[in-house]
UniProtKB/Swiss-Prot annotation:
The gene is dxr2. This is 1-deoxy-D-xylulose 5-phosphate reductoisomerase 2. It comes from Bacillus cereus (strain ATCC 14579 / DSM 31 / CCUG 7414 / JCM 2152 / NBRC 15305 / NCIMB 9373 / NCTC 2599 / NRRL B-3711). Catalyzes the NADPH-dependent rearrangement and reduction of 1-deoxy-D-xylulose-5-phosphate (DXP) to 2-C-methyl-D-erythritol 4-phosphate (MEP). One of its GO terms (biological process) is isopentenyl diphosphate biosynthetic process, methylerythritol 4-phosphate pathway involved in terpenoid biosynthetic process. InterPro entries: DXP_reductoisomerase, DXP_reductoisomerase_C, DXP_reductoisomerase_N, DXPR_C, DXPR_C_sf, NAD(P)-bd_dom_sf. Keywords: Isoprene biosynthesis, Manganese, Metal-binding, NADP, Oxidoreductase. Pathway: Isoprenoid biosynthesis; isopentenyl diphosphate biosynthesis via DXP pathway; isopentenyl diphosphate from 1-deoxy-D-xylulose 5-phosphate: step 1/6.
C-alpha cells in the first residue's frame, strides 16, 4: 500500500489520478490532497477517500468544508499546500497543480525525501536547476507524469543514458494545427478549447494550441534527462499514438506507443518499477489506425515553440520569465481580453525586456515571476 498526497485534485491530471487510485484501492491510499475553489468536488473526494488533510485556496472555504469533513483536517492557502506536500505518511507526492504555484511545494517535498510524480511542467521550467540539484542531494526520484516524458523514461529503462543521440518529442499540433497564421487572427476561445485528441484543462489546452505546451515539455525534458537542447527535437504527429521516441548513437530508435489516455502515464509513475492492469483503457490495434503521420515542426508557424528553445538555451532566469508571461497572457485570452496571437506578442515582449540572471536563487525566481506578471498585465 502506497500513501499518496495529491496537489491539484480537481484539475484534469488530478481527477484522472483519483481514477487510478479508485481502480486499485488495495494498492494506494490518498492521505492528503489540495483543491482550488471547487469545494463541492472536494466534499465528494473527502467522502470517498477519507484523507487526513485537505487544503483549499481560500480561507472562507475552510468553514464550509469543516462542517462535512469529519476527521479530515482542513487547511488553506500556500501554507496549506505545503502541509499537503509534506504529509508525514505520504510516500509519493503527485504535483498536478497548474502554474508556478507548484514550485515551492515540490522543493519542500524533495527536501523531505518524498518521491515526486511530476505533472506540473512549470516547476522544472522555472527552476529546473534548483529542483534537479535538490533531487540529487536528497536522493529523490522525479517520476514523469506527462505522457511524452513518461514515454522517454520508459524507453530509457535499462539503457545507458550516455548513449543517447536524440530525444524526439511528439506533438499533436493542438486545436489549430491545420490553420494558417492568417486564420489564427480570428479564432475564438471556444475554438481553442476543442483539442482533437486529449481531454485536458483549459490552460494546457490553450498552451497546446499555441505550442507553448510542447515548448515547456522541451525544457522539462532537458532537465529530467540531462540532454542538451540541440539534441531534443519535436515532430508533429497528429494521431498521438507514439508518445515520444529516443534515438541512440547507433541510430536505433525506441518509441513508446499507446491509445491517448493520461491514466497510463499517471499509473506508471505511481507503480514504478511495476505495472498494474488498466483494463478500461482502449487497447491499441494498429490495423484500426492504418497510417501514422509525421511532419517537421515549423517554428515560425509555432512561435511559442521557438521562444521556448530560445529561453531554454539562454538559461538562468529566462524560462521563468517566459512561463510567467505565458500564464498571464493565456489567462487574458481565456477572459477574451486579448486575441489569440497576442499571447505570442506578450511573451516576446517580456523576454526582450528581461536581463538574464545566470543562476537565480529561489527568492530571485519568485521575484522575477511576480515582476514579469506585472509587466505583462501593464501591456494588456
Amino acid at each position: 500500500m502506497k500513501n499518496i498526497s495529491l496537489l491539484g485534485a480537481s484539475g484534469s491530471i488530478g481527477t484522472q489520478t483519483l481514477d487510478v487510485l479508485r481502480s486499485h484501492p488495495d494498492q494506494f491510499r490518498l492521505v492528503a490532497f489540495s483543491v482550488g475553489k471547487n469545494i463541492d468536488y472536494a466534499v465528494k473526494v473527502i467522502q470517498e477517500f477519507s484523507p487526513q488533510i485537505v487544503s483549499v485556496q481560500r480561507e472562507e472555504d475552510v468553514l464550509k468544508l469543516q462542517s462535512v469533513s469529519g476527521n479530515t483536517k482542513i487547511v488553506y492557502g500556500s501554507e496549506g499546500l505545503l502541509e499537503v506536500a509534506l504529509h508525514p505518511d505520504a510516500e509519493i507526492v503527485v504535483n498536478a497543480v497548474v502554474g508556478s504555484v507548484g514550485l515551492l511545494p515540490t522543493l519542500r517535498a524533495i527536501e523531505a525525501k518524498k518521491t515526486i510524480g511530476i505533472a506540473n511542467k512549470e516547476t522544472l521550467v522555472t527552476a529546473g536547476h534548483l529542483v534537479m540539484e535538490a533531487a540529487r542531494k536528497h536522493n529523490v526520484s522525479l517520476l514523469p507524469v506527462d505522457s511524452e516524458h513518461s514515454a522517454i523514461f520508459q524507453c530509457l529503462n535499462g539503457e545507458n543514458e550516455k548513449r543517447i543521440s536524440r530525444l524526439i518529442i511528439t506533438a499533436s499540433g493542438g486545436s489549430f494545427r491545420d490553420k494558417t497564421r492568417d486564420e489564427l487572427h480570428h479564432v475564438t476561445v471556444e475554438d481553442a478549447l476543442r483539442h482533437p485528441n486529449w481531454s485536458m484543462g483549459s490552460k494546457i489546452t490553450i498552451d497546446s494550441a499555441t505550442m507553448m505546451n510542447k515548448g515547456l515539455e522541451v525544457i522539462e525534458a532537458h532537465w529530467l534527462f540531462g540532454i542538451p537542447y540541440e539534441q531534443i527535437d519535436v515532430v508533429l504527429h497528429k494521431e498521438s499514438i507514439i508518445h515520444s521516441m529516443v534515438e541512440f548513437e547507433d541510430r536505433s530508435v525506441m518509441a513508446q506507443l499507446g491509445s491517448p489516455d493520461m491514466r497510463v502515464p499517471i499509473q506508471y509513475a505511481l507503480t514504478y518499477p511495476d505495472r498494474l492492469p488498466l483494463s478500461d483503457t482502449k487497447q491499441l490495434n494498429l490495423w484500426e489506425i492504418g497510417t501514422l503521420h509525421f511532419e517537421k515542426m515549423d517554428q515560425e508557424r509555432f512561435r511559442c515553440l521557438r521562444f521556448a528553445y530560445e529561453a531554454g538555451k539562454a538559461g538562468g532566469s529566462m524560462p521563468a520569465v517566459m512561463n510567467a508571461a505565458n500564464e498571464v497572457a493565456v489567462e487574458a485570452f481565456l477572459q477574451k481580453r486579448i486575441g489569440f496571437l497576442t499571447v505570442e506578442d506578450l511573451i516576446e515582449k517580456a523576454m526582450n525586456h528581461h536581463n538574464v540572471i545566470a543562476r537565480p536563487s529561489l527568492e530571485e525566481i519568485l521575484e522575477i515571476d511576480a515582476a514579469t506578471r506585472r509587466f505583462v498585465m501593464e501591456q494588456i
